[in-house]
A protein has these predicted regions:
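Conserved beta-loop-beta connector loops within the AMP-binding
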Residues: 65, 115-133, 152, 168-171
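ATP-dependent adenylate-forming carboxylate-activation enzymes
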Residues: 6-24, 191-196
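AMP-binding/adenylate-forming catalytic core of the ANL superfamily
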Residues: 21, 32, 84, 120, ...
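Short Gly/Pro-enriched turn/cap motifs at secondary-structure boundaries
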Residues: 103-109, 123, 154-157
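Active-site glycine/GP-rich loop and adjacent strand/helix microenvironment
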Residues: 94, 106, 125-126, 141-145
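Glycine-centered tight turns that cap/initiate beta-strands
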Residues: 44, 52, 111, 149, ...
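Gly/Ser/Thr-rich phosphate-binding loop
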Residues: 3, 8, 23-31, 40-101, ...
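Acidic-histidine catalytic/liganding microenvironments
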Residues: 42, 157, 200-203
Length: 213
């Protein structure tokens, strides 16, 4: 956008009224999920206000399926959720042209290879939960002056171990289910807080939940 001279609005902090003031003059908005829930709680945020918008993008935190569906009902727009991290920038995205599925972060970006593996770095079957690993030109080379940590975070074949638990379906669509360190073992079963939160969040009267174990 900057190279093409496209005007951009950088706000010092999120303020729903200030965002609403700018919306009629912009075509793309990027934000975290909380921005979108707060906008929907603001009476002035209407479908008509979004008439000029081509695309709403979400990242930096998981977008609840309920927020995705509520935003679509409110505005007619399906938020494009994507996934990345400081060590790799963006690695996956729902398609710009194509189906955007609530609760997923889409497919690996061009040039990026993603896989879901077990604790021994062996790829798991489609639909099974494991640790998301990534490889590509966007992935960093290592932690500054921390060779031991760098070695522990990369596999022998050059994949960075993200620490995010995920599933990947047969066509490569990725769903993030939690963090590896958040795993709770109950009755011999692996339980991920995100899975419990998803079950609670669909209950009537629940806007959002947080599970800590």
């Amino acid at each position: 956008a900057m190279l093409r001279g496209i005007p951009m609005h950088f706000l010092p902090r999120f303020d729903a009224q200030e965002v609403i003031r700018h919306l009629p003059s912009v075509t793309v908005m990027m934000g975290v999920p909380t921005f979108y829930t707060r906008l929907m709680d603001t009476p002035e945020f209407t479908r008509e206000l979004c008439a000029a918008i081509r695309l709403f993008i979400s990242g930096s935190a998981p977008l609840l399926a309920q927020t995705f569906e509520a935003f679509f009902a409110h505005t007619g727009h399906r938020i494009l959720e994507r996934y990345g991290m400081s060590e790799a920038n963006m690695v996956a995205s729902n398609p710009l042209d194509g189906e955007r599925i609530a609760g997923t972060v889409g497919y690996a970006l061009p040039g990026v290879t993603l896989r879901v593996c077990d604790a021994e770095h062996n790829p798991v079957a489609a639909g099974q939960t494991g640790v998301l690993q990534m490889r590509g030109p966007n992935v960093f080379k290592g932690y500054w002056q921390m060779p031991e940590k760098t070695a522990s975070e990369f596999t022998e074949d050059g994949f960075f171990v993200s620490g995010d638990m995920a599933t990947m379906d047969g066509d490569g669509r990725v769903r993030i289910v939690g963090r590896e360190k958040d795993l709770v073992i109950s009755g011999g079963l692996n339980v991920y807080p995100k899975e419990i939160e998803d079950a609670i969040d669909v209950l009537e009267g629940v806007n959002e939940s947080a599970v800590i174990g």
